[in-house]
């Protein structure tokens, strides 16, 4: 294992509901109510730190899982001895450029989360790579990934990417995380037929479109964007989780073919009526808080979801009713959690 006499890395846990939980390792899973990153907990590189010389780091040629987290590394070099490495984590360093990885042909996972990288480059030798995380960097474009045909998970969260492009060769891709960027249009995803999870929270997207080819998609998160209409989801027949909170949606519609939905998050929009979802019989979680629901009869739309367990309706006009919780319990007897509180029996 690579070792260096520095302080232990700080663990981060950002509550990130609906966003990708897998960027990076299992110990730093990220979730957030609206797809935004908590400024108090988000990772941050500290440019005033002086980079260390890689010569001071001891590398074990036999090591398969190499951990070089928070080591103040300024340049990728000296890793050619790690011919057996399957995973390398270089997160929370001071790296400005991806380079000197040509010898790591057996690498399966590369973690460059929270550095100062401006360009995706010099990855062509990593043809066995299955997971790449370059979140929390300074990327402006998706590029340089053509040879990574085996990549299943790609995390580019919190960069400065303006458009979805150059992903055509990633036909094995199952998870794509592009949250917290500058994307305005959903596009160029047609070739990603294996994609199962797509995260686009906290961008500048105005329309749900160009998703027709994603037949295997089970999770779609487009929270904190500028969407005003529920549309373009008719071909996503395998969708199980849909996160659309913090947009400008006014009408519940367009979900006729999404019969497998188990989680529907449409909180913090402009919806006045719960409608057009009585066919969602597999629904287990329904998030409708921070809207404009005022009619108790609307809950009839949820009665066919016999396994419904969680309902969020707080900060709607309904909540002003003194019998708020009791009426929800009577209308939806299967529910075990109302807003943030579990029901006591």
Swiss-Prot record:
Basic and acidic residues bias locations: 13-30
CC terms in the record's Gene Ontology section: cytoplasm; nucleus
Top-rank taxon, per record: Eukaryota
UniProt keyword terms in alphabetical order: Leucine-rich repeat, Nucleus, Repeat
Principal place of residence: nucleus
Protein location: Nucleus
Record keyword Repressor present: no
InterPro entries in the record: Cilia_flagella_integrity (IPR050576), Leu-rich_rpt (IPR001611), Leu-rich_rpt_typical-subtyp (IPR003591), LRR_dom_sf (IPR032675), U2A'_phosphoprotein32A_C (IPR003603)
Domain LRRCT: 316-345
Ranges occupied by LRR repeats: 62-83, 84-105, 106-127, 128-149, 150-171, 172-193, 194-215, 216-237, 238-259, 260-281, 282-303
Pfam families per record: LRR_9
UniProt region (Disordered), positions on chain: 1-53
Function per UniProt: Regulatory subunit of protein phosphatase 1.
Family recorded in the similarity comment: Belongs to the SDS22 family.
Identification of the protein by name: Protein phosphatase 1 regulatory subunit 7
Native source organism of the sequence: Danio rerio
Lineage: Eukaryota, Metazoa, Chordata, Craniata, Vertebrata
Gene giving rise to this polypeptide: ppp1r7
């Amino acid at each position: 294992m690579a070792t260096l006499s520095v302080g232990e890395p700080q663990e981060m846990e950002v509550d990130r509901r609906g966003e990708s939980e897998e960027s990076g390792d299992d110990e730093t899973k990220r979730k957030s109510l609206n797809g935004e990153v908590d400024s108090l907990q988000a990772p941050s590189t500290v440019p005033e730190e002086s980079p260390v010389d890689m010569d001071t780091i001891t590398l074990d040629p036999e090591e398969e899982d190499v951990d070089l987290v928070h080591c103040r590394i300024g340049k990728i070099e000296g890793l050619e001895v790690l011919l057996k490495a399957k995973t390398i984590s270089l997160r929370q360093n001071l790296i400005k450029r991806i380079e000197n990885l040509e010898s790591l042909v057996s690498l399966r996972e590369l973690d460059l989360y929270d550095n100062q990288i401006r360009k995706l480059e010099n990855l062509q030798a990593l043809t066995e790579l299955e997971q790449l995380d370059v979140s929390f960097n300074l990327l402006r474009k998706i590029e340089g990934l053509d040879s990574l045909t085996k990549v299943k998970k790609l995390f580019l969260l919190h960069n400065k990417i303006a458009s979805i492009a150059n992903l055509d060769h990633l036909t094995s891709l199952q998870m794509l995380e592009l949250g917290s960027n500058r994307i305005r249009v959903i596009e160029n995803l047609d070739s990603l037929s294996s994609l199962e999870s797509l995260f686009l929270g906290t961008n500048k997207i105005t329309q749900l479109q160009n998703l027709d080819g994603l037949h295997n998609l089970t999770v779609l998160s487009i929270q904190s964007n500028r969407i005003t209409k529920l549309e373009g989801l008719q071909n996503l027949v395998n969708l199980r989780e849909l996160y659309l909170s913090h947009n400008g949606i006014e009408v519940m519609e367009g979900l006729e073919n999404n019969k497998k939905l188990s989680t529907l998050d449409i909180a913090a929009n402009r919806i006045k009526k719960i409608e057009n979802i009585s066919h969602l019989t597999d629904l287990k979680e329904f998030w409708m808080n921070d809207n404009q629901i005022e009619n108790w009869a609307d809950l009839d739309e949820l009665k066919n979801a016999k396994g419904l367990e969680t309902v969020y309706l707080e900060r709607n006009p309904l909540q002003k009713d003194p019998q708020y919780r009791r009426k929800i319990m009577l209308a939806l007897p299967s529910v075990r959690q109302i807003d943030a509180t579990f029901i006591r029996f």
